[in-house]
């Protein structure tokens, strides 16, 4: 009989495949899921609530982007909290237009994504006035919903890994306004006891 192994829980905003999960992989390595439970949360508010309720030991929060500055909803919640910063990581952010298999750019009528992702791709979107822009709570969740609905006239803006996770097709790549786009994430805990050992 094998002994149960404790795995600390880190919550992040978004669905699996979100850039926050990519940041966890960068911070802890590609085998992160072997040693840590990664818990998706639908909103920043839910993220801070889950740690306040003791349902996660850590949360990973996007705090600043090189193109758009502060991720203000996350910053506001962090500043109101008494959480300690126990780790930090910055990752490159590459945005892709992801649709259902067989989707082609000429047929896309609507694009959805998190407002921060949309803001980082404003030049691409401004050049496509025929495309309706739909803000959502999450980049990865947007891809999941587009694929689930099966509407080839809708696409989402998200990271490459989401296409792999949800069975989408990358229609256009590198939509961000600048190739050096990156986001800084903070690993937060209720106490300043350091990041988990993995």
Show where each model-derived region lies:
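Domain-level signature for soluble enzymes in the chorismate/prephenate branch of the shikimate pathway
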Residues: 1-198
């Amino acid at each position: 009989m094998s002994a149960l192994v404790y795995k600390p829980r880190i919550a992040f905003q978004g669905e699996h495949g979100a850039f926050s999960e990519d940041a966890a992989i960068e911070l802890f390595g590609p085998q992160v899921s072997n040693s840590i439970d990664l818990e998706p949360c639908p909103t920043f508010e839910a993220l801070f609530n889950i740690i306040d309720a003791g349902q996660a030991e850590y949360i990973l929060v996007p705090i600043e982007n090189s193109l758009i500055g502060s991720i203000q909803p996350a910053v506001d919640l962090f500043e109101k909290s008494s959480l300690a910063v126990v780790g930090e990581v910055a990752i490159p952010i590459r945005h892709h237009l992801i649709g259902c298999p067989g989707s082609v750019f000429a047929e896309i009528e609507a694009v959805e994504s998190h407002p921060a992702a949309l803001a980082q791709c404003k030049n691409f979107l401004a050049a496509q006035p025929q495309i309706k822009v739909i803000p959502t709570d999450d980049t990865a969740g947007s891809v999941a919903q587009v694929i689930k609905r099966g509407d080839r006239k809708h696409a989402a803006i998200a990271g490459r890994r989401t296409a792999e996770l949800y069975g989408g097709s990358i229609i256009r790549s590198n939509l961000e306004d600048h190739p050096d786009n990156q986001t800084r994430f903070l690993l937060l805990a209720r106490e300043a006891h350091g990041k988990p050992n993995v």
